[in-house]
Design a protein with these regions (language model features):
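Internal, well-ordered alpha/beta segment that forms a basic, Gly-enriched binding/recognition surface
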Residues: 103, 109-164, 168, 222-223, ...
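Acidic, Mg2+-coordinating catalytic module of metal-dependent nucleases/exonucleases
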Residues: 96-103, 147-213
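Short, glycine/acidic-enriched loop or turn micro-motifs at the edges of active sites
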Residues: 14-16, 103-104, 136, 186, ...
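Conserved non-catalytic scaffold segment of RNase H-like nuclease domains
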Residues: 1-119, 160, 168-170, 267-384, ...
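Acidic catalytic cores of enzymes that act on phosphate-bearing nucleotides/polynucleotides
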Residues: 207-280
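Short loop/turn segments at secondary-structure transitions that flank enzyme active sites
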Residues: 51, 140, 193-197, 260-263
């Protein structure tokens, strides 16, 4: 299997950095390239903050997009245009969607905000499409080829893998960093550089962009070098693929080849279950998510500098292959684990993974997006079965037409605005960010920074005044 020939690089700028279920994309850029990184098409769109979204001064100091505070373009219009463009680009031939730290940030924002706007949230990894987080590859390169780039080194002695820092060390002009389109260009140039320097590493990385490709890579690779970095610190393991979890097709069960093979094979069924339940550093098992980018490469091709000799790791991998009954036992044990239950979310903005919209509603969504008259859209909203869909539909209509709506929709929208702007919750707090603005005015004294801080502060004060007197 070869990875897709089309690559779609995307990046966002947002109203905030924290409270990620409630911050909003206000700029999105995408670049479509071929497999040789030649640009085929691009898009760069922006919008105003939603009436119930609180912009934060720190975020605007980073991306400087204060013009969006007065934009006439709505969030719905922007998200719909992104969705339509991505579907057009990947319709005839699937694509790989590439972000930088996107699986922790941008990708989740796109998904949730497609969900808010009654659009398919999983456009980037369905219908043959794949998704990759370039940060994972950059971290692998910093470990396997530390001299390939003159990486900036942090106070802990580790390479800095922030996009702006890495491409700056390659000699690119980063004066316009944190503009979504500029960051897309940086990603293209960085991946092009990696491909020229280490084509096999990049090919394997891009193959892993889909679940099928990732499973193929795991299955054909005798010893896999796996860099696990949940936070600032990372661990590297030599692992072998055992199989897919029969009850969760997104999980690959692997075994750590560092452990004495006799000890692992002699584990009781209960011990196997216990280690699978907590596949941490002390466990001989590791669980790989097939639907997210991982830091993985062929340890027989690339030197991970494992303490255990490579010949011994290969011998261990072969011995596991000689024990198919034991492998089956491990896979059966993975099916006996209790599925983790996450606490229910009280706010519909956060419920994307709790329950998917039904087929009937999804069919109506497309009619809603295509409808031209307000009357038709209101009628379609009334036909939605899922109460969340009705609420999101009403929010969309309020963005687009605040005056000609039924009184109950206007009333519920104003109640939502008042709740977000005047009460405490999981969303950004106006008081917190007004205080932040005051502090930043003393810390960031350049005229350009002062202009940004004052613009956001004025927006917050004007809107809270309107809410309190509305």
């Amino acid at each position: 299997m070869k990875y897709q020939n089309k690559l779609i690089f995307s990046d966002t700028e947002t109203t905030g950095r924290d409270e990620r279920d409630f911050i909003q994309i206000i700029q999105s850029a995408s670049l479509l390239t071929d497999e040789k990184f030649q640009t085929l098409d691009s898009m760069n769109v922006s919008c105003a903050p939603l009436p119930w979204t609180i912009p934060t001064p720190g975020a605007y100091l980073t991306h400087k997009k204060i013009d969006t505070l007065q934009s006439s373009d709505t969030h719905y219009q922007m998200m719909k245009s992104i969705h339509e463009q991505w579907k057009t680009w990947s319709q005839e031939e699937p694509a790989i969607f590439i972000t930088y730290n996107g699986h922790a940030f941008d990708e989740e924002l796109y998904r949730k905000q497609f969900f808010w706007n009654l659009l398919d949230p999983f456009v980037t990894n369905t219908n043959g499409n794949g998704r990759s987080d370039l940060l994972m590859l950059t971290r692998l390169v910093s470990q396997l080829f530390p001299d390939l780039i003159d990486f900036e080194i942090n106070k802990n002695g580790n390479p800095v893998c922030r996009l702006e820092s890495v491409v700056g060390r390659l000699g690119l002009d980063t004066s316009n960093a944190h503009d979504a389109l500029s960051d897309c260009v940086f990603m293209v140039e960085l991946l092009k550089f990696f491909k020229a320097a280490q084509p096999k590493l990049v090919d394997d990385y891009l193959l892993q962009a889909t679940k099928q490709g990732c499973a193929e890579f795991l299955g054909k690779t005798k010893v896999i070098g796996y860099r696990h970095q949940p936070f600032a610190r990372f661990w590297t393991y030599p692992i072998k693929f055992l199989g897919i979890n029969p009850t969760n097709q997104n999980e690959a069960i692997c075994v750590d080849l560092n452990y004495p093979i006799e000890d692992v094979i002699d584990l009781s069924y209960q011990d196997i279950m216990g280690y699978l339940a907590k596949p941490n550093a002390e466990s001989p098992f590791k669980i790989i998510r097939l639907n997210k980018s991982q830091g993985m490469a062929d340890a027989n091709e690339f030197d991970f500098k494992f303490d255990c000799p490579l010949a011994e790791l290969n011998a261990n991998a072969e011995r596991y292959d000689e024990n198919p009954e034991w492998i089956e036992r491990v896979l059966v044990a993975s099916t006996d684990l209790e599925q983790k239950e996450w606490p229910k979310k009280a706010v519909i903005d956060q419920t994307i993974y709790e329950k998917f919209f039904g087929n009937g509603d999804r069919n109506l969504f497309q009619k809603f997006h295509n409808a031209h008259s307000l009357e038709e859209k209101l009628s379609l909203c009334d036909r939605f079965n899922d109460s969340r869909a009705k609420a999101f539909g009403h929010r969309i209509l309020f963005q687009e037409n605040k005056t000609n709506l039924p009184a109950e929709i206007i009333s519920s929208s104003k109640a939502l605005i008042k709740e977000r702007w005047t009460s405490e919750g999981p969303w950004p707090s106006v008081e917190t960010y007004l205080s932040e603005a005051e502090e930043l005015k003393h810390e960031r004294t350049s005229p350009a920074d002062q202009q940004i801080i004052v613009a956001v502060e004025s927006y917050l004060k004007h809107n809270i005044q309107g809410v309190n007197h509305g």
